[in-house]
C-alpha cells in the first residue's frame, strides 16, 4: 500500500526529510536524471499465466506438470493534472525475505490516470534472483514522470520470500516478461480500465537486472546454447530447450512490440549460456550496463562479451569502473538493511550497495542514460539521442567553457554532466554490423 503524504520543500533533494527515499536526485547528478514534469500514480496488479510448466515438480521421464503461474506487477503511470506528489510504500520486504520496511517516493496510490493526447510507451522492469518489484522502484517513478507507463514484476519463485529452484528462473524469466506485456495489452483494451488510452504496448522497452537482464537478452533475440540446457544444475528435463538459439520456440518469443532493451549486469555469458552465434540473434537496440568488477555476471567474459557479440544491432555499454554486481540497479539500501539479519549469513545492506560507488549517484547516472536511450529508441527523440554521443572514456573528456558559459572549441565533456562529475565511467557504442 502507499499512503498519500504531504511533503515540503524540494521533493528531489530532501533526502533528510524521510527515511528510505527512492526519489533522491543528487545536486551533482547529470541533467537527464531529474524527474520529469508529470505527476504520477501507482497501482498493484495481480495476473495469472495459465498452463505453465511447473518447474519445481518436473521429473525426468514424466509428463510435464502444469500450473497457473501468478505474478504481481507494480504499475507507475502519469497521473491526472492536479494530482499531488508523495507517498509511502508499506510492507516492502528486504533481502532476508522477512523484514519489512517503508519506502518513500513521489507516486500517489490509485491516482486517477492522465488523459494524454496519445498513449505512453510501456517499460517492463524485471528484477534479479532473488529480488522484488521494488528493487528498482527509483527507475519506476523517475521514468513515469517522463511519460512512460512502467510495470515492475514480482517474479514468482524468484522473490525474497519465495525463492525456489534456479531452473524456474531460467525458464520463466523471459516468459514472464512477455506475458506481462500481453496482460497490459489486454487491460489497455478494456473499456473503463485505468490503462485504456494510457499505454501503447506496440512501443515497449524492457529493463532487466541480473536474471532480469538474462531474460531481456533472450527476448531481444539471444537464444541460449545447447550446453546450457544440459548442465547438471540446469532447468530439468530439457525445459530450457524452448529458449535454444535457432529453435522455432525461441524465434516465436521475438515480439515486434519490444523495440529496445536495457540489460543491467545480465547473468549468463560467463557461465556458457550464450555464445557468439547465439548472440547474433539479438536484433533489438541494447543498452548494457555493468560494473567492471562484477564477480557474479563477469565483465570481460560476461557483460562486455555480450555487448561485443551483439553484432546484429545498435548497442551501448555503460561501465561503472571498479563497481561490482550491484552497479546501477538496486535502490539505496534501506536504513533497516544496515543491521544483521538472523535469516542471512551476510548483512542485507550488501544486497543493495557497492563498496566503491554511492548508490544514489549510480541510480542518477542510470536514470540519465536510460532516459536518453529510450527517448531515442521508443520516442524517436533525436535530441535525447545526442546525450549518448560521448567520448568513450570520461577521463578523456575535456570541460572547457568561456566565462559566459559557452563551450570552447576543445570542449567535449559528457553532455549534461556538470564539471568534474563524469568520473569513473565509460560508454562504448557500436552499430549493427560492427
PLM regions and their residue ranges:
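Active-site machinery of serine-nucleophile hydrolases
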Residues: 73-82, 134-161, 167, 174-175, ...
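Alpha/beta-hydrolase active-site loop
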Residues: 167-201, 217-218, 228-247
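Short alpha-helix in the alpha/beta-hydrolase fold that links the catalytic acid
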Residues: 275-276, 297-308
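Gly/Ala-rich beta-loop-alpha elbow adjacent to hydrolase catalytic centers
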Residues: 208, 212, 216
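Short beta-strand/loop motif that positions the catalytic acidic residue
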Residues: 282, 288-290
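Short substrate-entry loop that stabilizes the transition state in hydrolases
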Residues: 109-120, 125-162, 270-271, 295-299
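Alpha/beta-hydrolase-fold serine-hydrolase catalytic core, especially in secreted/extracellular enzymes
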Residues: 19-27, 57, 313, 322-325, ...
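Domain-level recognition of soluble alpha/beta enzyme cores
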Residues: 18-123
Amino acid at each position: 500500500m502507499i499512503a498519500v503524504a504531504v511533503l515540503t520543500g524540494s521533493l528531489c533533494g530532501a533526502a533528510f526529510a524521510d527515511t528510505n527515499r527512492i526519489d533522491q536526485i543528487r545536486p551533482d547528478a547529470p541533467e537527464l536524471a531529474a524527474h520529469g514534469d508529470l505527476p504520477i500514480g501507482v497501482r498493484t496488479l495481480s495476473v495469472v499465466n495459465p498452463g505453465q510448466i511447473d518447474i519445481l515438480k518436473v521429473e525426468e521421464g514424466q509428463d510435464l506438470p502444469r500450473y497457473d503461474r501468478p505474478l504481481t506487477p507494480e504499475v507507475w503511470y502519469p497521473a491526472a493534472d492536479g494530482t499531488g506528489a508523495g507517498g509511502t510504500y508499506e510492507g516492502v520486504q528486504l533481502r532476508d525475505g522477512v523484514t519489512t520496511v517503508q519506502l518513500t517516493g513521489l507516486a500517489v496510490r490509485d491516482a486517477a490516470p492522465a488523459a494524454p493526447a496519445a498513449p505512453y510507451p510501456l517499460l517492463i522492469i524485471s528484477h534479479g534472483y532473488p529480488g522484488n518489484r521494488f528493487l528498482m522502484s527509483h527507475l519506476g517513478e523517475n521514468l513515469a514522470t517522463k511519460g512512460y507507463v512502467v510495470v515492475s514484476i514480482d517474479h514468482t519463485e524468484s522473490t525474497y520470500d519465495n525463492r525456489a529452484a534456479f531452473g524456474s528462473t531460467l525458464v520463466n524469466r523471459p516468459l514472464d516478461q512477455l506475458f506481462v506485456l500481453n496482460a497490459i495489452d489486454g487491460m489497455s483494451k478494456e473499456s473503463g480500465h485505468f490503462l485504456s488510452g494510457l499505454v501503447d504496448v506496440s512501443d515497449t522497452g524492457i529493463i532487466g537486472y541480473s536474471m532480469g537482464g538474462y531474460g531481456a537478452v533472450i527476448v531481444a533475440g539471444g537464444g541460449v546454447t545447447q550446453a546450457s540446457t544440459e548442465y547438471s544444475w540446469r532447468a530439468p528435463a530439457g525445459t530450457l530447450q524452448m529458449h535454444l538459439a535457432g529453435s522455432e520456440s525461441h524465434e516465436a518469443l521475438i515480439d515486434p512490440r519490444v523495440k529496445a532493451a536495457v540489460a543491467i549486469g545480465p547473468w549468463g555469458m560467463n557461465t556458457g549460456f550464450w555464445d557468439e552465434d547465439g548472440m547474433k540473434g539479438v536484433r533489438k537496440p541494447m543498452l548494457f550496463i555493468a560494473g567492471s568488477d562484477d564477480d557474479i555476471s563477469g565483465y570481460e567474459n560476461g557483460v562486455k562479451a555480450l555487448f561485443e557479440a551483439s553484432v546484429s544491432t545498435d548497442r551501448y555499454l555503460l561501465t561503472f569502473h571498479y563497481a561490482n554486481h550491484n552497479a546501477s540497479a538496486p535502490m539505496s539500501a534501506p536504513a533497516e538493511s544496515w543491521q544483521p539479519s538472523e535469516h542471512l549469513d551476510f548483512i542485507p545492506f550488501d544486497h543493495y550497495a557497492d563498496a566503491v560507488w554511492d548508490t544514489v549517484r549510480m541510480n542518477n547516472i542510470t536514470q540519465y542514460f536510460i532516459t536518453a536511450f529510450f527517448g531515442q529508441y521508443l520516442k524517436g527523440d533525436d535530441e535525447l539521442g545526442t546525450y549518448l554521443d560521448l567520448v568513450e572514456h570520461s577521463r578523456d573528456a575535456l570541460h572547457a567553457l568561456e566565462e559566459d558559459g559557452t563551450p570552447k572549441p576543445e570542449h567535449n565533456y559528457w553532455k549534461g554532466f556538470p564539471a568534474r562529475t563524469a568520473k569513473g565511467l565509460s560508454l562504448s557504442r557500436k552499430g549493427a554490423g560492427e
